[in-house]
Amino acid sequence: MRKVLDEPFGNPSSGHWAGRPARVAVENARNEISNFLGCKPQEILFTSGGSESNNHALKGVYFASGKPNAQIITTYIEHPAILNPCRFLEGLGAAVTYLGVDHFGQVDPDNVRRAITPRTVLISVMHANNEVGTIQLITDISKIAREHGILFHTDAAQSVGKIPTRVGELGVDLLSLAGHKLYGPKGIGAL
């Protein structure tokens, strides 16, 4: 990591000689992450961290829907990086449904199904909870989202690198991660 932070000084988006090594480093990282997550390299958007990734997922889907009263389904146990953008979107007219959990911290997929309305554009449920360790039934929830044609996001900052987190197997459309949670530097994330 130190080598990458110290040596390729150029802007990876520039076309000149100083940017080329940085561009190679970024693309190598993109390929490694895509192999690790089981997705295509072009599906990875690098961000400044997990919070920015979550903001892009929530706000991006909401604004792209074109529905000012669109519904987002999430849970009460989400990280503030999910809850705060949801509150922001509520201020703009979004309907955010917050689901409770059982005594193990588990979201009941049937409660997700019951919360869906014709206005639902996104379901966002964290993969693993950092406080109680609960691993959510993401594949079950993703099937429900698919049945209804709804996009599904999971904040996987706490799970990536600790448990299998393959995008295709989970069935998610959007997955957020934070670099510092898996031996990367602070200030790096991906969606």
Tell me what each language-model feature is.
Residues 1-191:
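Pyridoxal 5′-phosphate
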